[in-house]
Amino acid sequence: MQASRHSIQAEPGWYVSAQQPEEAVAADEWSPLLSNEPHRQGSSGASFGLSVFNVMNAIMGSGILGLAYVMANTGILGFSFLLLFVALLASYSVHLLLAMCIHTAVTSYEDLGLFAFGLPGKVVVAGTIIIQNIGAMSSYLLIIKTELPAAISEFLPSDHSGSWYLDGQMLLIIICVGIVFPLSLLPKIGFLGYTSSLSFFFMVFFALVVVIKKWAVPCPVTLDCINEVFQISNATDDCKPKLFHFSKESVYAIPTMAFSFLCHTSVLPIYCELQSPSKKRMQNVTNTAIALSFLVYFVSALFGYLTFYDKVESELLQGYSKYLPHDVIVMAVKLCILFAVLLTAPLIHFPARKALMMILFSNYPFSWIRHSLTTAALNAIIVVLAIYVPDIRNVFGVVGASTSTCLIFVFPGLFYLKLSREDFLSWKKLGALFLLLTGAVVGSFSLVLIIFDWVNK
């Protein structure tokens, strides 16, 4: 059985039919990506828990702030179905990626593209990863730029307008130089496991505060509700939750959710540093991370929507800034969510830098100078984008509709159909085809509608 497994890894294709089905499944579940991984025999490598935190940190970023707005434009049941649907598809696409990596003996998303379609496939995948992750990091830093000055000013006893520490652009540059850049310079993604755990607990605290503050804002929502606490919501038409709803704004639903569940570019680097790595163990890491992220997403979106209903902002924190500007708990949770978003940026930076260096310097040995210069260049790009992109929804919609849907749905399905030698009517190939078609339809349709909406405005 061991020899059979290595023969599969050595071939430039899939030869699953050479094994009995039950033997192939057993090999898939416990096969490592590489037959020679020294760290598997020792105690080095990231633990299961830290790996879960890293995957959750890759999943949970600024997307959590836009989901209440999505629920307001799709309804509670509509949102629940769509969120569950995208989460299941995200988990299944990771399953396909891990299966392909086992049978092709490659360790990166870009190399899967190379294995399937040659050099053009590698370049397309790497370019998609770079664009998507730059868009994600820009949206994270955009939140820092817009929200951090207001969060700081709320703790100040008097007016300090004009001060450098209330200048969003200045704070953004300082944070990128002092925090994001040093963390991004770390050579291994596993080093960020502890900062990822801190980021996740900040997100959980945010969700709990959203639940508690549902009763702090009376309904109907008016500016007179400032400083009111624990008011009972009135049963008016404005305060009745919608189970299903569709409007022009609903077009942002799927792209925003796809953006919120994207962890695929970080899964393989995290897998390579996992203790006792196997396909089954990494799938369990991913499923645990997606399930916990789904829970936090749903709770924060539901109670955020039930707080503001149709008046919910596209960025949830803006609503609390407007109606509860001096609430101490809200002031604290703003800083927590900002730090959580900030700590996500370095994790997303790793796949972007790796993709860029695989395109430009794939034949060169590792160099700290090249590593540092590439990191600095990427940080400079995302700072510029964060300064000049005015609306976070633009980032969510366009990036989610184009690159995120490719990385979650299109590429895993397409590569599996290309590389697998299973019968076309097998369940996995049909699932891969469904994944591919879903991504192509959803991504194209959403992108067209978003552009059409912009033109009308």
Swiss-Prot record:
It comes from the Eukaryota. GO terms for cellular component: plasma membrane; synapse. The modification Phosphoserine is found at S4, S7. Disulfide bonds join C219-C239. It catalyses: L-glutamine(out) = L-glutamine(in); L-glutamate(out) = L-glutamate(in). It is found in: Cell membrane; Synapse. One of its GO terms (molecular function) is L-glutamine transmembrane transporter activity. InterPro entries: AA_transpt_TM. The modification N-acetylmethionine is found at M1. The chain crosses the membrane at residues 48-68, 70-90, 112-132, 171-191, 192-212, 251-271, 289-309, 328-348, 372-392, 395-415, 432-452. It is a multi-pass membrane protein. It holds the Pfam family Aa_trans. Keywords: Acetylation, Amino-acid transport, Cell membrane, Disulfide bond, Membrane, Phosphoprotein, Synapse, Transmembrane, Transmembrane helix, Transport. Expressed exclusively in neurons and not in astrocytes and glia cells. Highly expressed in the synapse. Highly expressed in glutamatergic neurons. Primarily expressed in excitatory neurons, with some minor expression in inhibitory neurons. Amino acid transporter with an apparent selectivity for L-glutamine and L-glutamate. May facilitate glutamine uptake in excitatory neurons. The transport mechanism remains to be elucidated. Belongs to the amino acid/polyamine transporter 2 family. This is Solute carrier family 38 member 6. It comes from Mus musculus.
